[in-house]
């Protein structure tokens, strides 16, 4: 509350929704499955596979931005050529490109189905998901190391606007 810059992107940021269908008419031509329970598990598995495959692209875009920000922070801190900083940036790039490779692999190893759809490789999609549950956090940890503590302990906008704290924050940041 009382902040404009700490809100994130309220137009295009993430969102969740609860959708309730109560007494809704759905025309037959729009019904996807009707009492075909034996296919429900396969449908969920395939949906999850495509969702996991897409992580290989979307999380990597965020990683690219974070890697660029970490490199800029190293530059601002006057240490862009330090070997330990370069090693961390290289590791971040390696981890991020590993995620991308997982997304590409499960797509490239997919096969067409009899119905004309294209099914990604579900095993490799799960490998992609497993890497997505770990590697972005390691990339963020390395970015924190490079940027220094200010990246993770930066004062809030409310502190910046505070009559007593604001001048101190502005002096050092």
Where are these regions (language model features)?
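Glycine-rich beta->alpha junctions and the first turn(s) of the following alpha-helix
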Residues: 2-96
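Short amphipathic alpha-helical patches
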Residues: 44-48, 97-98, 112-116, 155-170
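Long, well-ordered mid-to-C-terminal structural blocks that present hydrophobic/aromatic surfaces
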Residues: 62-138
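Alpha-helix capping/hinge segments and adjacent helical runs
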Residues: 123-173
């Amino acid at each position: 509350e009382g902040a404009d810059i700490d809100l994130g992107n309220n137009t295009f940021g993430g969102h969740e929704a609860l959708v309730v269908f109560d007494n809704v008419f759905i025309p037959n031509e729009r019904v996807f499955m009707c009492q075909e329970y034996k296919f429900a598990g396969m449908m969920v598995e395939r949906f999850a596979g495509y969702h996991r495959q897409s992580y290989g692209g979307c999380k990597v875009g965020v990683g690219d931005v974070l890697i660029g920000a970490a490199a800029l922070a190293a530059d601002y801190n006057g240490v862009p050529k330090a070997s330990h900083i370069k090693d961390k940036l290289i590791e971040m790039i390696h981890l991020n490109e590993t995620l991308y490779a997982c997304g590409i692999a499960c797509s490239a190893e997919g096969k067409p189905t009899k119905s004309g759809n294209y099914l990604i490789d579900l095993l490799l999609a799960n490998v992609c998901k497993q890497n997505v549950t770990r590697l972005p956090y390691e990339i963020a940890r390395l970015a924190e190391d490079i940027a220094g503590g200010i990246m993770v302990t930066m004062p809030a906008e409310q502190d910046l606007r505070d009559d007593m704290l604001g001048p101190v924050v502005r002096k050092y940041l």
